[in-house]
């Protein structure tokens, strides 16, 4: 048997406790199966009953397609937090964020503890200790920081992060017709590239834990329901649900591919990190 020493990531936000040590002792040994694990985050994806209640959007076809493939879809689920950094730092460290943390949640100031806790988290640390490779996919946004333990990093970023491009588009540079400064095109490139690369994960011989953060259907919307660039004139809500439909299509295709190509049945988790967030409203952001 191999002894797996568990270190204590999570930074100062999640210091180790006695209960942690009791749950996973340092001499813990694991010799069971190691299926590939996929943790797929769809940023800003609403719960299906909330879509229907407030916007009369029927998402039942997608939900039923998941259940037919063996997924459990949790009813009435909701995020514990209303922003990506808070939500992911909590889930990846399997703990609530301390209530006395000095963070401005409305203006997203002093988010460094959350960013560090996402990059150096307990889930990845534990899985790597028992022999998993860590595959990380994101748009390089700070809220989904990859940390120092990544074995395979999937990114289509060439010049600047999506957030940097957003800032640049607020300056005089916004008039330059460069793809690297085009937020919509960059989002499209990142997402299409990400789905393509995830299809290659089942080819890896070693067991993998894949964390994949897709900035969809989060604003700015970059896809209509057919995968094309959204047309001008549609409302934010219409654009949001069009991108939901395209996200549904891509997730279904990806799940089918992973299930077909995996020698050992994988574990696949698909979730939203928070609810719908329009630029001028935080309505239903937790659901």
Regions found by a protein language model. Name each.
Residues 1-287:
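Catalytic domains that recognize anionic headgroups
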């Amino acid at each position: 048997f191999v002894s797996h020493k568990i270190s204590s990531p999570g930074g100062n936000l999640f210091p180790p406790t006695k209960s942690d040590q009791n749950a996973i002792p340092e001499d813990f040994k694991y010799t069971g199966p190691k299926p590939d694990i996929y943790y797929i985050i769809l940023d800003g994806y609403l719960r299906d009953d909330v879509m229907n209640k407030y916007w009369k959007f029927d998402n039942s076809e997608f939900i039923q397609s998941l259940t037919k493939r063996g997924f459990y879809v949790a009813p009435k689920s909701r995020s514990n937090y209303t922003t990506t950094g808070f939500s992911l730092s909590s889930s990846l460290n399997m703990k609530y964020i301390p209530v006395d943390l000095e963070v401005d949640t409305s203006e997203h100031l002093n988010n460094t503890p959350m960013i560090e806790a996402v990059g150096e988290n307990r889930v990845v640390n534990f899985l790597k200790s028992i022999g998993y490779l860590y595959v990380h996919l994101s748009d390089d946004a700070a809220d989904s920081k990859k940390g120092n333990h990544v074995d395979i990093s999937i990114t289509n970023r060439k010049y600047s992060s999506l957030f940097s491009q957003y800032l640049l588009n607020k300056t005089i540079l916004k008039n330059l017709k460069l793809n690297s400064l085009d937020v919509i095109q960059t989002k499209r490139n990142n997402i299409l590239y990400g789905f393509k690369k995830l299809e290659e994960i089942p080819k890896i011989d070693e067991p993998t834990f894949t964390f994949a953060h897709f900035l969809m259907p989060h604003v700015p919307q970059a896809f209509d329901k057919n995968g094309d660039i959204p047309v001008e004139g549609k409302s934010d809500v219409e654009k949001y649900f069009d991108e939901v439909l395209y996200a549904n299509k891509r997730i279904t295709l990806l799940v089918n591919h992973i299930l077909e190509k995996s020698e050992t049945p994988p574990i696949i988790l698909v979730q939203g990190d928070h609810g719908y967030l329009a630029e001028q409203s935080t309505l239903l952001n937790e659901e």
